[in-house]
From Swiss-Prot:
Coiled coil: none annotated. 4'-phosphopantetheine is transferred from CoA to a specific serine of the apo-ACP-like protein. It comes from the Bacteria. Keywords: Cytoplasm, Fatty acid biosynthesis, Fatty acid metabolism, Lipid biosynthesis, Lipid metabolism, Phosphopantetheine, Phosphoprotein. One of its GO terms (cellular component) is cytoplasm. It is found in: Cytoplasm. This is Acyl carrier protein homolog. Pfam families: PP-binding (PF00550). InterPro entries: ACP-like_sf (IPR036736), PP-bd_ACP (IPR009081). The keyword Lipid biosynthesis applies.
Amino acid sequence: MRELTSEIKKEIRDIVYDFFSEECEVDINELNDNTSVVDDLDGDSLMLIELVDILKKKYSLNIQLQSIGKYLLKNPAETLEKVVQTTYLLYEYENDITNVGEK
């Protein structure tokens, strides 16, 4: 498990917001944690895959799309806050994200 520092958290949050602002052609100042990816931004699951690909390259993450898919089936990332929280977990747990919350 990787350590998720406050600096990395800020960096990841900025990446998520910048990504959705650019991809959805929305001013970043109009985005907030409650912004719905689908309803407010007309986003889709392919955007999340593209975002994960960016994070994989930036942080050398070892994660399979299947692992992300399994996690998202149980924990949908519907708002920007949930996308940010999911990307934090991806950074920390990589493929083990599917086991997060299990005992």
